[in-house]
């Protein structure tokens, strides 16, 4: 169970570069593994496609938007203006159903945005 978490909001920087946030996430991951504080990164990206390990060429439309290959599972994902992205960089202290945990975090973020700002957010 996570008891406290640092929130690192990049929203005041406007749209940020995916690669920079990816590097930050990896650095924070190393810190957390070494006993550092759990962190939520909150950001919004410049238009970018990320291509997971299962991405096929036809998964990404022909476009001038940059495509960044990632080591994550899955296929293509678009990131861009109007999309709030939250990355939890945490040490899970006990075995958990990871998909269920991610869905719970996602639901909490959606509920918080809806309640705090009254925005019509959805998954």
Feature names for model-found ranges:
Residues 1-123:
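N-terminal lobe of the biotin/lipoate ligase/transferase fold
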């Amino acid at each position: 169970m996570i008891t406290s978490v640092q929130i690192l909001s990049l929203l005041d920087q406007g749209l940020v570069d995916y690669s920079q946030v990816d590097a930050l996430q990896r650095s924070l991951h190393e810190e957390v593994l070494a006993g550092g504080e759990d962190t939520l990164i909150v950001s919004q990206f410049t238009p970018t496609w990320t291509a997971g390990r299962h991405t096929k060429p036809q998964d990404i439309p022909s476009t001038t938007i940059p495509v960044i290959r990632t080591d994550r599972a899955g296929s293509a994902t678009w990131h861009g203006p109007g999309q709030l992205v939250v990355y939890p960089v945490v040490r899970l202290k006990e075995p958990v159903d990871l998909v269920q945990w991610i869905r719970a975090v996602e639901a909490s973020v959606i509920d918080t945005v809806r309640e705090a700002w009254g925005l019509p957010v959805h998954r």
